[in-house]
């Protein structure tokens, strides 16, 4: 199964194309801003490098966050726009799920994943023995650190970088009904409509 995996939730713009356990092409660039302008050309580049066309893709996978409102939407919108006319399934996984995927769920480890989402805030989540203790939560740094310390984690993953290849491998066997591509924003949009309403 050929899976195209995308991530635009953080400072990196990433696209990976894998076939079962084989990496066909992979690109990741630290760009901070401009994901919307870079992602489509990046996908075209990895398709060309693999000598494949869009019709050769079987499934899409996208990192759903936590990330900024704008950045998170870039890969999500691209994935859904790519998949819809081709009737392809789209799998959504959080960056925290991707970063903890290599831990053995039978090891009974308490693992905390932390992302610095700027503005003095951290987004963090926790798992224990493969089960969710805390879904991604954004809090002021001092509050988050106290909560994490009280939890007493065995391992902490901080500001990890999503590997698109791992995202593709994980997504290959997942059901889109159980892992929908829904955004996980670290905070709401900065832009406001007249009257202070969110867009």
Task: Report each predicted region and the residues it spans.
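Short glycine/serine- and small hydrophobic-enriched flexible loop segments
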Residues: 44-45, 80, 84, 170
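Oxyanion-binding and handling regions
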Residues: 1-23, 30, 34-37, 91-199
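DPxDG-like acidic metal-binding loop motif
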Residues: 59-90, 95
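Short, well-ordered amphipathic alpha-helical segments that serve as non-catalytic structural scaffolds
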Residues: 35-50, 96
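A short glycine/serine-rich beta->alpha loop
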Residues: 26-31, 64-68
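Phosphate/pyrophosphate-binding loops at sites that engage ATP/ADP/AMP, CoA/4′-phosphopantetheine
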Residues: 43-59, 151
């Amino acid at each position: 199964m050929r899976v195209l995996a995308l991530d635009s939730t953080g400072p990196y713009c990433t696209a990976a194309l894998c076939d079962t356990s084989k990496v066909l092409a992979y690109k990741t660039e630290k760009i901070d801003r401009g994901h919307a302008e870079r992602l489509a050309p990046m996908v075209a580049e990895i398709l060309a490098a693999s000598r494949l066309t869009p019709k050769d893709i079987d499934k899409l996978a996208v990192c759903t966050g936590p990330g900024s409102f704008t950045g998170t939407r870039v890969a999500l919108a691209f994935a859904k726009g790519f998949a819809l006319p081709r009737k392809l399934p789209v799998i959504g996984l959080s960056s925290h799920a991707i970063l903890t995927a290599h831990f053995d769920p039978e090891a009974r480890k308490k693992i905390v994943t932390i992302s610095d989402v700027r503005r003095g805030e951290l987004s963090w989540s926790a798992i224990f023995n493969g089960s969710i203790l805390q879904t991604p939560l954004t809090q002021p740094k001092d509050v988050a650190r106290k909560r994490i310390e009280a939890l007493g984690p065995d391992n902490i993953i901080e500001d990890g970088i999503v590997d698109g290849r791992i995202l593709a491998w994980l997504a290959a066997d997942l059901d889109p009904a159980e892992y929908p591509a829904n955004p996980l924003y670290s905070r709401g949009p900065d832009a406001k409509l007249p009257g202070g309403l969110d867009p």
